[in-house]
Amino acid sequence: KNEELKFEYRNSIISQKNIIVLETRLKLKKGESQEIKSKMDEYAKSRKEKQPIEYPSAGSTFKRGKDFITAKLIDEAGLKGYQIGGAQVSEKHAGFIINKGDATATDILNLIEYVKKEIHKKFDKNIELEVQVIGEK
């Protein structure tokens, strides 16, 4: 239940305490199959237009800030397309770091740190990772 897990925008007790969910029960609503398919197609089209799904990535790299849109700041900082090794800030959506083909974990982590430092330097904002980094460089 929401009260127990304290769900909020991209956060919950589950993510704070590194809990692994092994089982869940979902409550679904019935709907018209054609209407559901139409919505799914709409979401897929929107995702394809706005997100760099043609390249490997871990999805959205940075969380949206409380009072700012992180991807917008990254774009305004001129970092779209910025690359370290094979890791690049997506030109399609600045909130994604993509693998242009030969990125190493070190390339990606170095690019993340560079973006975080540039945003802090230019806008005095601290941006948070949405992805979880496991392991070391």
Language-model segments: residues:
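Phosphate/pyrophosphate- and phosphate-bearing ligand-binding catalytic cores of soluble enzymes
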Residues: 1-110, 117, 122, 126-137
